[in-house]
Amino acid sequence: MNIINLEGFRQIPANEGLCENYYSTNIISALNENGVTLINDMSGSVTSVCRGTQAVNTVERTGLIFTTPSYVTLYSTLPDLKASAVQLGFRLTLSAGKKYSSSPSHIRINGYSFTTPYPDEAASYYYEIFATRNENGYVSASLYCNRSLAGNTSFYVSDDRTDKIQVSIGSGDNIFSSGASGTLMLGDMYCGTVAYGKNNSAEPALLGAIEVRYSPVTAFTGGSAKNSLDKDIVTGLNTSDSDAGYLMLSPSPEAAQVTFGAVDNSNGDLVAVMAAVTYRSADAPNNCLAWSVKSGSHEGETVTENDVQADTNSWTTVSQSFTTQPDGDIPFTEGEIIFATELYNQPTTSRQ
């Protein structure tokens, strides 16, 4: 499996309201500004949203917490199923409280539901959905809970809709009994692709559960860059709040280098690493972002974001993911690993 996206929400400040008014459009806009791409739509009624930690059976879980008096549904659009099979994993935690239904459907794919019962006490389960599409256009999807098969479904999808299939997480009905509020927490997400074999056959590569950690920026170098408010660049890079300012990257052949905090792989259990850049495009319409990721002497290719439709009024996130060292098939070394990115603001015709 090739893991292409990771999301643990830990880059969002803890225990602070995500936005001022909890309308769906405001919440999605705030998630975009924080670089979240695995959740691209939502519906429902919520009274608060924050990144926080909850203890379930003495185990602390971290994620994005939605407080709701009724229901909330989060949507994740899958990669094109015509190109590969897809596996999506996430942890879904519901707080203690009388549940509205004894046989609810908290997870759906393309509108087709799986039964996912939760007890009245707090509970946290790790789910993985594996989906394939055969040559006749029929999608088969299986849901696994803590590695055990929880359900199957199938449906037809035309060729022009294979990149529009959504997984919905949450419920369109009340989650808790009438008149009661509770919390839904989503965390530790990943999305991966699995290559098709003969006749579009593919098998899941279940992980069971993962923990997505976060490495903040620890250092910055680059003489052609500055903070938009003339404040500390490192603080600005670690903060989505505009009060800390943003990095302004001037056109230059010189790379600006961002170094991240060490990744702990002392147990050799590192599955994947993702570096992401959230940015607004340059005022100059013929310029774009180019960037690479490296770890020590292992440096990946420079990616030029020529085709990204970013603008100066909204935030766009691009990412690079690795299941081995950035320059090839060399496994991650055990111990601490330090990653860095090199950033360029340059004409779109350069570094092709």
Label the predicted regions.
Residues 1-42, 187-228:
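Extracellular carbohydrate-recognition regions
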Residues 127-154:
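Carbohydrate-binding surfaces in secreted/extracellular proteins
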Residues 173-188, 331-332, 348-352:
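Extracellular carbohydrate recognition
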Residues 108-127:
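Short, aromatic/His-centered strand-loop micro-motif at the edge of beta-sheets
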